[in-house]
Protein backbone atom coordinates (compact mmCIF):
# COMPACT_ATOMS: atom_id res chain seq x y z
CA UNK A 1 0.00 0.00 0.00
CA UNK A 2 1.16 3.51 -0.78
CA UNK A 3 2.46 5.31 2.30
CA UNK A 4 0.20 8.27 1.59
CA UNK A 5 -2.74 5.98 2.38
CA UNK A 6 -1.11 4.23 5.33
CA UNK A 7 -0.14 7.46 7.11
CA UNK A 8 -3.70 8.69 7.45
CA UNK A 9 -4.89 8.86 11.05
CA UNK A 10 -8.44 7.56 11.56
CA UNK A 11 -9.57 10.85 13.08
CA UNK A 12 -8.78 12.74 9.89
CA UNK A 13 -10.69 10.26 7.79
CA UNK A 14 -13.62 10.30 10.19
CA UNK A 15 -13.83 14.08 9.91
CA UNK A 16 -13.92 13.71 6.14
CA UNK A 17 -16.63 11.07 6.44
CA UNK A 18 -18.78 13.31 8.60
CA UNK A 19 -18.89 15.77 5.70
CA UNK A 20 -21.22 13.30 3.98
CA UNK A 21 -24.32 15.16 5.09
CA UNK A 22 -27.88 14.37 4.04
CA UNK A 23 -27.62 16.43 0.86
CA UNK A 24 -24.54 14.51 -0.31
CA UNK A 25 -26.18 11.16 0.43
CA UNK A 26 -29.33 12.21 -1.43
CA UNK A 27 -27.22 13.16 -4.42
CA UNK A 28 -25.53 9.78 -4.30
CA UNK A 29 -28.90 8.06 -4.16
CA UNK A 30 -30.15 9.99 -7.17
CA UNK A 31 -27.13 8.91 -9.19
CA UNK A 32 -27.50 5.23 -8.34
CA UNK A 33 -28.89 2.94 -11.05
CA UNK A 34 -32.11 1.09 -10.33
CA UNK A 35 -34.06 3.97 -8.77
CA UNK A 36 -37.62 2.77 -8.23
CA UNK A 37 -36.59 -0.89 -8.27
CA UNK A 38 -37.06 -3.03 -5.16
CA UNK A 39 -33.91 -2.83 -3.00
CA UNK A 40 -33.54 -6.63 -2.92
CA UNK A 41 -33.47 -6.73 -6.73
CA UNK A 42 -30.89 -3.94 -6.94
CA UNK A 43 -28.69 -5.72 -4.42
CA UNK A 44 -29.05 -9.08 -6.18
CA UNK A 45 -28.01 -7.58 -9.53
CA UNK A 46 -24.96 -5.94 -8.00
CA UNK A 47 -24.02 -9.17 -6.24
CA UNK A 48 -24.02 -11.06 -9.54
CA UNK A 49 -22.04 -8.28 -11.22
CA UNK A 50 -19.38 -8.33 -8.49
CA UNK A 51 -19.12 -12.11 -8.55
CA UNK A 52 -18.24 -11.94 -12.24
CA UNK A 53 -15.24 -9.65 -11.70
CA UNK A 54 -11.61 -10.49 -10.98
CA UNK A 55 -10.53 -8.85 -7.70
CA UNK A 56 -7.40 -6.73 -7.32
CA UNK A 57 -6.03 -7.14 -3.80
CA UNK A 58 -3.71 -4.14 -4.03
CA UNK A 59 -6.62 -1.87 -4.85
CA UNK A 60 -8.68 -3.65 -2.20
CA UNK A 61 -6.15 -2.51 0.41
CA UNK A 62 -6.56 1.09 -0.74
CA UNK A 63 -10.35 0.87 -0.67
CA UNK A 64 -10.19 -0.72 2.78
CA UNK A 65 -8.68 2.45 4.24
CA UNK A 66 -12.22 3.83 4.47
CA UNK A 67 -13.40 0.68 6.26
CA UNK A 68 -10.46 0.63 8.68
CA UNK A 69 -11.76 3.72 10.49
CA UNK A 70 -14.41 1.57 12.19
CA UNK A 71 -13.34 -2.02 11.55
CA UNK A 72 -9.65 -1.29 12.33
CA UNK A 73 -6.76 -2.08 9.96
CA UNK A 74 -6.86 -5.73 11.00
CA UNK A 75 -10.61 -6.07 10.40
CA UNK A 76 -11.20 -7.22 13.97
CA UNK A 77 -13.98 -4.78 14.85
CA UNK A 78 -14.77 -4.12 18.52
CA UNK A 79 -15.78 -6.52 21.30
CA UNK A 80 -18.32 -3.98 22.59
CA UNK A 81 -20.57 -5.02 19.69
CA UNK A 82 -20.46 -1.77 17.73
CA UNK A 83 -18.45 -3.26 14.85
CA UNK A 84 -18.17 -6.92 13.80
CA UNK A 85 -15.02 -8.83 13.10
CA UNK A 86 -15.02 -8.93 9.29
CA UNK A 87 -11.51 -10.33 8.79
CA UNK A 88 -11.70 -13.84 7.39
CA UNK A 89 -15.43 -13.64 6.69
CA UNK A 90 -16.64 -15.55 3.64
CA UNK A 91 -16.32 -13.33 0.59
CA UNK A 92 -19.82 -14.09 -0.69
CA UNK A 93 -21.20 -12.94 2.66
CA UNK A 94 -19.23 -9.70 2.54
CA UNK A 95 -20.40 -8.98 -1.00
CA UNK A 96 -24.05 -9.66 -0.20
CA UNK A 97 -24.10 -7.56 2.96
CA UNK A 98 -22.32 -4.65 1.29
CA UNK A 99 -24.65 -4.79 -1.72
CA UNK A 100 -27.67 -4.98 0.59
CA UNK A 101 -26.56 -2.00 2.66
CA UNK A 102 -25.91 0.27 -0.31
CA UNK A 103 -29.19 -0.79 -1.95
CA UNK A 104 -30.92 -0.15 1.40
CA UNK A 105 -32.02 -3.75 1.59
CA UNK A 106 -30.36 -3.75 5.03
CA UNK A 107 -30.70 -0.67 7.22
CA UNK A 108 -27.34 0.50 8.55
CA UNK A 109 -27.37 4.30 8.89
CA UNK A 110 -23.79 4.43 10.15
CA UNK A 111 -22.28 2.40 7.32
CA UNK A 112 -24.53 3.54 4.49
CA UNK A 113 -22.70 6.83 3.74
CA UNK A 114 -19.41 4.92 3.48
CA UNK A 115 -20.93 2.40 1.07
CA UNK A 116 -22.43 4.68 -1.59
CA UNK A 117 -20.75 4.54 -5.01
CA UNK A 118 -19.33 8.07 -4.89
CA UNK A 119 -17.44 7.14 -1.69
CA UNK A 120 -16.67 3.43 -1.99
CA UNK A 121 -16.72 3.08 -5.76
CA UNK A 122 -18.49 0.65 -8.06
CA UNK A 123 -18.74 -3.10 -8.46
CA UNK A 124 -15.00 -3.47 -9.08
CA UNK A 125 -14.18 -1.78 -5.78
CA UNK A 126 -16.57 -4.13 -3.98
CA UNK A 127 -14.87 -7.08 -5.66
CA UNK A 128 -11.47 -5.76 -4.59
CA UNK A 129 -12.21 -4.84 -0.98
CA UNK A 130 -14.19 -7.99 -0.18
CA UNK A 131 -11.41 -10.18 -1.54
CA UNK A 132 -8.93 -8.22 0.58
CA UNK A 133 -10.98 -8.47 3.79
CA UNK A 134 -11.77 -12.16 3.37
CA UNK A 135 -8.07 -13.05 3.38
CA UNK A 136 -7.16 -11.01 6.48
CA UNK A 137 -6.26 -13.26 9.44
CA UNK A 138 -8.68 -13.26 12.35
CA UNK A 139 -8.23 -12.74 16.06
CA UNK A 140 -9.43 -15.40 18.49
CA UNK A 141 -9.50 -12.67 21.16
CA UNK A 142 -13.02 -11.67 20.18
CA UNK A 143 -15.58 -10.56 22.75
CA UNK A 144 -17.06 -13.48 24.68
CA UNK A 145 -20.27 -13.91 26.66
CA UNK A 146 -20.70 -14.51 30.40
CA UNK A 147 -19.68 -18.19 30.23
CA UNK A 148 -22.41 -19.37 32.59
CA UNK A 149 -24.62 -21.56 30.36
CA UNK A 150 -22.34 -23.12 27.78
CA UNK A 151 -23.82 -26.63 27.85
CA UNK A 152 -27.26 -25.20 27.11
CA UNK A 153 -25.73 -23.04 24.39
CA UNK A 154 -24.01 -26.04 22.82
CA UNK A 155 -27.27 -27.99 22.69
CA UNK A 156 -29.22 -25.06 21.28
CA UNK A 157 -26.58 -24.43 18.64
CA UNK A 158 -26.61 -28.07 17.53
CA UNK A 159 -30.41 -28.12 17.35
CA UNK A 160 -31.03 -24.74 15.76
CA UNK A 161 -27.93 -23.25 14.14
CA UNK A 162 -25.41 -25.86 13.00
CA UNK A 163 -27.41 -26.99 9.96
CA UNK A 164 -26.90 -23.60 8.30
CA UNK A 165 -23.89 -22.02 10.04
CA UNK A 166 -21.88 -25.27 10.26
CA UNK A 167 -20.81 -27.44 13.18
CA UNK A 168 -17.82 -25.18 13.87
CA UNK A 169 -19.52 -21.92 12.89
CA UNK A 170 -17.72 -21.87 9.54
CA UNK A 171 -20.70 -20.63 7.52
CA UNK A 172 -21.71 -21.53 3.97
CA UNK A 173 -20.21 -19.59 1.07
CA UNK A 174 -22.61 -20.97 -1.55
CA UNK A 175 -25.67 -19.78 0.34
CA UNK A 176 -23.87 -16.68 1.72
CA UNK A 177 -24.52 -17.76 5.30
CA UNK A 178 -21.98 -16.00 7.52
CA UNK A 179 -19.27 -17.66 9.51
CA UNK A 180 -20.00 -16.97 13.18
CA UNK A 181 -16.90 -18.51 14.74
CA UNK A 182 -14.79 -15.74 16.23
CA UNK A 183 -17.57 -13.16 16.08
CA UNK A 184 -18.04 -10.77 19.00
CA UNK A 185 -20.72 -11.86 21.46
CA UNK A 186 -22.31 -8.43 21.85
CA UNK A 187 -22.43 -7.90 18.08
CA UNK A 188 -24.21 -11.25 17.76
CA UNK A 189 -26.68 -10.19 20.46
CA UNK A 190 -27.42 -6.99 18.57
CA UNK A 191 -28.01 -8.78 15.27
CA UNK A 192 -30.01 -11.60 16.89
CA UNK A 193 -32.36 -9.04 18.44
CA UNK A 194 -32.68 -7.10 15.18
CA UNK A 195 -33.49 -10.24 13.19
CA UNK A 196 -36.05 -11.50 15.69
CA UNK A 197 -37.73 -8.08 15.86
CA UNK A 198 -37.91 -7.82 12.06
CA UNK A 199 -35.48 -4.90 11.83
CA UNK A 200 -33.10 -6.74 9.47
CA UNK A 201 -34.82 -6.50 6.10
CA UNK A 202 -32.37 -8.92 4.49
CA UNK A 203 -32.64 -11.57 7.22
CA UNK A 204 -33.37 -15.15 6.21
CA UNK A 205 -37.05 -15.77 7.05
CA UNK A 206 -36.16 -19.29 8.19
CA UNK A 207 -33.83 -17.88 10.83
CA UNK A 208 -36.40 -15.33 11.96
CA UNK A 209 -38.87 -18.15 12.58
CA UNK A 210 -36.21 -20.39 14.14
CA UNK A 211 -35.20 -17.92 16.85
CA UNK A 212 -38.57 -16.32 17.51
CA UNK A 213 -39.30 -18.32 20.67
CA UNK A 214 -35.87 -18.08 22.30
CA UNK A 215 -35.91 -16.86 25.90
CA UNK A 216 -33.32 -14.29 27.05
CA UNK A 217 -31.43 -17.10 28.80
CA UNK A 218 -31.40 -19.23 25.64
CA UNK A 219 -30.29 -16.30 23.50
CA UNK A 220 -27.40 -15.53 25.83
CA UNK A 221 -26.41 -19.19 26.07
CA UNK A 222 -26.32 -19.94 22.35
CA UNK A 223 -24.55 -16.71 21.40
CA UNK A 224 -22.05 -17.17 24.23
CA UNK A 225 -21.30 -20.65 22.90
CA UNK A 226 -21.02 -19.33 19.36
CA UNK A 227 -18.63 -16.57 20.43
CA UNK A 228 -16.30 -19.27 21.78
CA UNK A 229 -16.12 -21.26 18.55
CA UNK A 230 -12.56 -20.85 17.31
CA UNK A 231 -11.87 -20.34 13.58
CA UNK A 232 -9.68 -22.87 11.80
CA UNK A 233 -5.97 -22.48 12.68
CA UNK A 234 -5.06 -21.35 9.17
CA UNK A 235 -7.49 -18.42 9.49
CA UNK A 236 -5.97 -17.04 12.71
CA UNK A 237 -3.42 -14.25 13.03
CA UNK A 238 -0.13 -14.99 14.74
CA UNK A 239 0.40 -13.41 18.19
CA UNK A 240 1.23 -9.72 17.89
CA UNK A 241 0.26 -9.52 14.21
CA UNK A 242 -0.63 -6.09 12.84
CA UNK A 243 -1.71 -5.44 9.27
CA UNK A 244 1.52 -4.65 7.38
CA UNK A 245 -0.43 -2.78 4.70
CA UNK A 246 -1.00 0.00 7.27
CA UNK A 247 2.46 0.44 8.84
CA UNK A 248 1.93 4.06 9.93
CA UNK A 249 -1.76 3.88 10.76
CA UNK A 250 -2.59 5.36 14.16
CA UNK A 251 -4.54 2.70 16.04
CA UNK A 252 -6.47 4.54 18.76
CA UNK A 253 -7.69 2.72 21.88
CA UNK A 254 -11.17 1.31 21.38
CA UNK A 255 -13.54 0.73 24.32
CA UNK A 256 -13.59 -2.95 25.23
CA UNK A 257 -10.72 -3.83 22.88
CA UNK A 258 -7.46 -3.90 24.85
CA UNK A 259 -5.49 -5.81 22.24
CA UNK A 260 -4.56 -9.33 21.11
CA UNK A 261 -2.52 -10.32 24.16
CA UNK A 262 -4.66 -8.82 26.94
CA UNK A 263 -7.36 -10.68 28.82
CA UNK A 264 -10.69 -8.89 29.17
CA UNK A 265 -13.63 -9.62 31.48
CA UNK A 266 -16.51 -11.56 29.96
CA UNK A 267 -19.64 -9.67 28.96
CA UNK A 268 -22.80 -9.93 30.99
CA UNK A 269 -25.95 -11.51 29.60
CA UNK A 270 -28.41 -9.31 27.69
CA UNK A 271 -31.11 -7.71 29.79
CA UNK A 272 -34.32 -9.70 30.25
CA UNK A 273 -37.07 -8.42 28.02
Q: What role is predicted for each listed range?
A:
Residues 31-64, 77-80, 131-156, 249-257, ...:
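Electrostatic cytochrome c docking/interface patches
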Residues 50, 57, 68, 72-106, ...:
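Gly/Gly-Pro-rich "capping" loops immediately C-terminal to redox-active cysteine motifs
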Residues 218-273:
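Long hydrophobic alpha-helical segments typical of transmembrane helices together
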Amino acid sequence: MSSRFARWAPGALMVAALALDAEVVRAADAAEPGAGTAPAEVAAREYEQVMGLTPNLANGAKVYLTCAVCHRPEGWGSPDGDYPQIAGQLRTVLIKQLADIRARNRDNPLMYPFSVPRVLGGAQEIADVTAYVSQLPMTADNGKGPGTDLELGKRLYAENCAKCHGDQGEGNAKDHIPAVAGQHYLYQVRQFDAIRAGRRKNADPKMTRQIHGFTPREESAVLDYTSRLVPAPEKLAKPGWLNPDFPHYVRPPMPGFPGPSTTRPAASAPATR
